[in-house]
Amino acid sequence: MYQGHMQLVNEQQESRPLLSPSIDDFLCETKSEAIAKPVTSNTAVLTTGLDLLDLSEPVSQPQTKAKKSEPSSKSSSLKKKADGSDLISADAEQRAQALRGPETSSLDLDIQTQLEKWDDVKFHGDRTSKGHLMAERKSCSSRTGSKELLWSAEHRSQPELSTGKSALNSESASELELVAPAQARLTKEHRWGSALLSRNHSLEEEFERAKAAVESDTEFWDKMQAEWEEMARRNWISENQEAQNQVTVSASEKGYYFHTENPFKDWPGAFEEGLKRLKEGDLPVTILFMEAAILQDPGDAEAWQFLGITQAENENEQAAIVALQRCLELQPNNLKALMALAVSYTNTSHQQDACEALKNWIKQNPKYKYLVKNKKGSPGLTRRMSKSPVDSSVLEGVKELYLEAAHQNGDMIDPDLQTGLGVLFHLSGEFNRAIDAFNAALTVRPEDYSLWNRLGATLANGDRSEEAVEAYTRALEIQPGFIRSRYNLGISCINLGAYREAVSNFLTALSLQRKSRNQQQVPHPAISGNIWAALRIALSLMDQPELFQAANLGDLDVLLRAFNLDP
């Protein structure tokens, strides 16, 4: 169990390569040796037993016996009376079973292969004395629509033929008695099948007629198009005619959910107060002040920038992406927002978009934009929010731009350029080179806690969890309220088997989020679901069912008391 969970968390950090591993990715990953827990909305990660369910359909026993009898019948001649009877009985049973129940395609193909071996084999009996019997057998075969496993005279010796004729002559009545019930059942199944096919055919015809009628109604579609265009035009006019003091909402802003009961929405100097709280490490309150600043001035690109960066540090990546996108709509050359957006895209596995943001960073940078102009015919990136793996040629093209820019700088180190290089090496899985790039940036900015966190995440993804703990610890020394780094530290503790320390870090992060919001008397505190999910995993590894139940219920006070932490 220990090994399974260790591999689980390692896979998670690889799937979220830069700032932090998303708990959602390894909520779907399970191991067979884990202990099954009660199924709730919050414990999907622990219900591991369901992943091992074999959904393949078993082969029915009668068909298995029938299939086994076929090869043996091929090798033996019709020497005894019972042989002929058994052959027909098994064949009739096989055909009836094939029509009665649904089987897998592989099973159907397997039976078809056995029958096709004898497709060209015919039984030519004595047409004078036994003609009526052969006519009856051929009639039965044609009515049922299946192939009889009959033996060719060319494949048997003369004594065998005489013996076979004698057996068929004496047992003709029993053969027909056995074939008749099977024939009746097969005929009934054919009627049902024909009725079903006829019904499906009529439904298909009805659907095609309805589809053709709708497609041919061009007047209807032209009217719908005209109404849609008119509605869009009216909305555009009404938005432009709004009063100047009213807050307009763009498409990006609609994707961002502001706190409805923000006590600072009318606070004078909300942006400056937000910067002050950010330096103090009070991330939840910083977010409230930045939202207030934006509500007062929706066109404040810098407020959107800091809102996005703070949301990322507060372990809320989706809100960060929306805020940073809005910032870049207002200010396309905002280099800090572009780099932060590239990091957030990387964390959410949007590799194509991360490459595009990094390329735009070069294009918008006055020091390096000439490099893009010199690269004629470089592949463009037009896909938005795509989680498919980045094209290797595109990634190599952007990486080449950054390496060329670094070469142009000579001995001078540009920390922002090195940060971009670190992200690119991360995307390509070159963790050691990414570590070198982040270390180079830290030589210029040793007090940049976000760089220390990125270095820690890179070390962790490079299977160097002990060094990652040191990097995360350094980031928290500089910024104690850095919730994302606290979360990452907990993940690395799980990797190292230090489950109690992991729980302590997760609880500290949750407590920081709640404490900050409670001090401002803001209802419904926003606490990261990722942290709660990681906490449940750590508690399950500690084999603490009572505490695990408290985590399921979101009872933070019980958990804090259990681990002797201040509420």
Curated annotation (Swiss-Prot):
Coarsely, its chief localization is cytoplasm
Coiled-coil regions listed: none
GO BP terms: maintenance of protein location; regulation of membrane potential
Which regions does the record annotate with the repeat TPR?
Answer: 267-300, 301-334, 336-368, 415-448, 450-482, 484-516
Could you tell me the superkingdom of the organism this chain comes from?
Eukaryota
- Phosphoserine PTM sites in chain numbering: S146, S194, S198, S202, S386, S388
Q: How does it sit in the membrane?
A: Peripheral membrane protein
The entry describes its oligomerization and partners as:
Interacts with RAB8B. Forms an obligate 4:4 complex with HCN2. Interacts with HCN3. Interacts with HCN4 with a 4:4 HCN4:PEX5L stoichiometry; reduces the effects of cAMP on the voltage-dependence and rate of activation of HCN4.
Role summary: Accessory subunit of hyperpolarization-activated cyclic nucleotide-gated (HCN) channels, regulating their cell-surface expression and cyclic nucleotide dependence.
What's this protein's family per the entry? Belongs to the peroxisomal targeting signal receptor family.
The protein here is known as PEX5-related protein
